[in-house]
Amino acid sequence: MARVKRGVTARARHKKVVALAKGYRGRSKNCYRAALQRLEKALVYAYRDRRNRKRDFRRLWIVRINAAARQWGIKYSQLMKGMALCGIELNRKMLAEMAVNDKAAFEKVVSAVAGTCGYACAVNQQDK
C-alpha cells in the first residue's frame, strides 16, 4: 500500500480555520489550536444567540407597544385582547413599528379597540 503524506490536507484545514478566525485578538487569530477553540466557542455563541435574538426582539416590541399604548391610557394586555376581539390582525413587529414611526395609525388602532371593547382611553376622551 502506498504511503499517504497528509501535509497538504492538514495545511489546507489549518489555513481554513485561521482564515475563519480573522479579526480575533491575541493568539486566537494565528495559532491553529487557539483559533480552533475560539472558533468552536464562537459558533456555539452564534447558535445560541440566533435563538435569543427572537426572544429579545419580541420583548422589545412588547415594551414599545406597551409604552405607546399607555400614552393613550390603555394597557398592552387590553390592547392585544381588544385587537383579537376586533379582528385586527397586526403582529407585534408591525404594531411596534407603527407605535414608533406612525403614531396616527397606531392611534386609530387604539381608538378602534377602545371603541369596540369600551375601554376608557385618552383617544375616546379627546373626541368628547
UniProtKB/Swiss-Prot annotation:
Domain of life, per UniProt, equals: Bacteria
From the UniProt annotation, give the residues forming the signal peptide. none
The record, for NCBIfam families, names: rplT_bact (TIGR01032)
Q: Which GO terms describe its molecular function?
A: rRNA binding; structural constituent of ribosome
- The species this protein belongs to is Anaplasma marginale (strain Florida)
Task: Provide GO CC annotations from the record.
Answer: ribonucleoprotein complex; ribosome
Query: Can you say what this protein is called?
Result: Large ribosomal subunit protein bL20
Q: Which PROSITE patterns match?
A: RIBOSOMAL_L20
Species classification: Bacteria, Pseudomonadati, Pseudomonadota, Alphaproteobacteria, Rickettsiales
This protein's UniProt keywords: Ribonucleoprotein, Ribosomal protein, RNA-binding, rRNA-binding
Protein family per UniProt = Belongs to the bacterial ribosomal protein bL20 family.
- Give the protein's biological function: Binds directly to 23S ribosomal RNA and is necessary for the in vitro assembly process of the 50S ribosomal subunit. It is not involved in the protein synthesizing functions of that subunit.
A Pfam family annotated for this chain is Ribosomal_L20
| Record-level GO BP terms | ribosomal large subunit assembly; translation
